Every structure is written in structure tokens, then in C-alpha cells.
A protein has these predicted regions:
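A glycine- and small-aliphatic-rich helix-loop capping segment at beta-alpha/alpha-beta transitions
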Residues: 76-88, 113, 117, 183-192, ...
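Short hydrophobic targeting helices and cationic amphipathic motifs
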Residues: 3-7
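N-terminal glycine-/serine-/threonine-rich phosphate-binding loop
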Residues: 20-63, 141
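Class I SAM-dependent methyltransferase SAM-binding "motif I" and its flanking Rossmann-like core
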Residues: 167-213
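Glycine-rich beta-strand-to-loop/alpha-helix junction loops that act as flexible
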Residues: 65-70, 170-174, 226
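ATP/nucleoside-binding phosphotransfer catalytic cores, i.e., glycine-rich phosphate-binding loops
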Residues: 213, 219-277
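Ligand-binding beta-strand-loop-alpha-helix segment within the catalytic cores
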Residues: 22-27, 87-166
Length: 277
């Protein structure tokens, strides 16, 4: 699949249109902000617009949250800025996770704990709208199976059918991983499961992660990438040869949705204005 990218910059910076391969190719956008704060402000705006566009007031809006440090600033805006917080229909927002560490929910490394402390406990989110990974299970494979069952029940899925999230938030590491899809790991090649326990050798642990088919079935995928340490990987993911075993973020190519990269200047330092993958 060929993706065509529209490169945008924020505020007074001039937008640049990138080459278009054909009218039928799926379109992704890249927004480049000055710093992490600007990146997260833009992401909050995307979430707000998505909620505003929702045509069915009673329909749940489903999000998959990401881990890492980058989302903290986004959470602070969503939960702490009245201009954003007071406009979001929190009673309709359902929160899931793109991946989780195999630790109890109160562990400092828990993605759930980070999201709860920085967002979910500070916003009027009904308890029943929080769908965390049962990562306290001693057996990581069982935790993945239980979370898959949670998705199947909530989204009322038929066998083999992936859920359609309204929005999946993703990050990217300096090694090009996203969610817990790490270079060279088995989960990169999973096509039938919704959730798997993925052994990550460099950490000597399992990570529980949504699979590529689930991520690519979302209505909107938003990558948030910040920091100079990710610049080389970002260039490879967006402009390098297609090597998803080495740079797993290249696997994220929505089958019938939108893809948006919001990155800061430090992360975008090696990108050119001609981005076609």
C-alpha cells in the first residue's frame, strides 16, 4: 500500500503539500509542532473535533490510550483545561489501552496507573467506561485472552472480526516500536488474535498489546512523537525502506481510516518535504 502524506505546520508556519501518488491512495497527515506542548494541544484539538463530529449523541466514543511519557501532557490538557474538558462528552467516552506492561494496576510502570493518575481520576469519567487490561494476571497469555474477550463483548464482535475504535493514540520509541510491537517480536506477524502477550527479549518480560489488524481497523489513528532521540527512527518509518520487522511503526497503515502523525520539531529534524511511503 502506498500512503500519501500532507505535511502541515502549526500557527503561522506555512503548510506544504506533499506529492500525491494517486487519487485513490489512503491519505495521512503529518503535523509538525514546535514542542511537546504544541503537539499535545493539537492532539487535544483533534479529539475535540472528533467528539463534536459524532453524529449519534447516544453512541459511545471509544479510545485506546498509549503509555510512555508523551501522553501525560495531553492528559493534562484534556482533564485540566476547562475549554477542552467542559466540552467533552465524558459520559460517552470509553477508554481502553493499546498496550500494557505485565504488572499490577498499582505498579509505577503500569500504563493504566499513569492514565488514571493524569487523566481518568481528574475528569468525570464513569467507572464503567474504563476498560483496563487485567495485567495483574500471573499468566500474561491469560491476561491477553481476557482482554480480547472484553473487546469482543463490548464491541459485540463476530468471530475473527476486529473492533473499530473511534480513536487510537499511539507513540513511537527510538527503536521504531509502537504499542508493544517491538522490533523482531512475534506479535508483528499476528493476524488472527485481537490481543496477544508479546515477549520482549530486551526487557525480559511480556507486554500485552493490541495486534496490527486491530490498530489498522480504527477510524482515526494519532501518533504523538516528541524528542530528538526519535528523529532517526521517525525518518526511517516515514521515509526509509519498508522494514517493519526493524521499524514496527511502519505496520500502521489503516485499512479504512485516517492516520495522523503529530510530531515536534526535534523529532522531525531529519524529515524532508517529500514524504511518500
Amino acid at each position: 500500500m502506498v500512503l500519501k502524506y500532507f505535511l502541515e505546520t502549526f500557527k503561522s508556519r506555512k503548510a506544504t503539500l506533499n506529492p500525491i501518488m494517486s487519487n485513490s491512495t489512503p491519505t495521512a497527515r503529518i503535523k509538525i509542532g514546535y514542542d511537546l506542548a504544541e503537539v499535545c494541544r493539537a492532539a487535544a484539538g483533534e479529539i475535540q473535533r472528533m467528539a463534536d463530529r459524532s453524529a449519534t449523541p447516544a453512541k459511545p466514543l471509544t479510545f485506546a490510550l498509549s503509555g510512555g511519557s508523551t501522553p501525560r501532557s495531553l492528559h493534562a490538557i484534556l482533564a485540566g483545561d476547562p475549554a477542552v474538558r467542559d466540552r467533552l462528552p465524558w459520559h460517552r467516552l470509553h477508554f481502553f489501552w493499546g498496550d500494557e506492561r505485565h504488572v499490577p494496576s498499582d505498579d509505577p510502570q503500569s500504563n493504566y496507573r499513569m492514565a488514571y493518575e493524569t487523566l481518568l481520576s481528574l475528569a468525570p469519567v464513569p467507572t464503567q467506561n474504563i476498560h483496563r487490561v487485567p495485567a495483574e494476571e500471573p499468566d500474561a497469555a491469560l491476561a491477553a485472552e481476557k482482554y480480547e474477550q472484553e473487546l469482543q463483548a463490548f464491541f459485540k464482535l463476530e468471530a475473527g472480526q476486529p473492533p473499530r475504535f473511534d480513536c487510537i493514540l499511539l507513540g513511537m520509541g527510538p527503536d521504531g516500536h509502537t504499542a508493544s510491537l517491538f522490533p523482531g517480536t512475534e506479535a508483528l506477524h499476528e493476524t488472527k488474535r485481537l490481543v496477544v502477550a508479546n515477549w520482549v527479549e530486551k526487557f525480559k518480560t511480556y507486554r500485552i498489546t493490541l495486534t496490527v489488524p486491530v490498530l489498522n481497523h480504527a477510524d482515526l489513528i494519532v501518533f504523538l512523537v516528541s524528542g530528538a532521540e526519535k528523529a532517526e527512527a521517525l525518518k526511517e518509518v516515514l521515509q526509509g525502506d519498508y522494514r517493519p520487522d526493524r521499524f514496527p511503526a511502519q505496520l500502521i497503515r489503516p485499512d479504512n481510516g485516517k492516520l495522523l502523525w503529530i510530531v515536534d520539531k526535534a523529532a522531525a529534524r531529519y524529515l524532508t518535504h517529500s514524504i511518500i511511503i
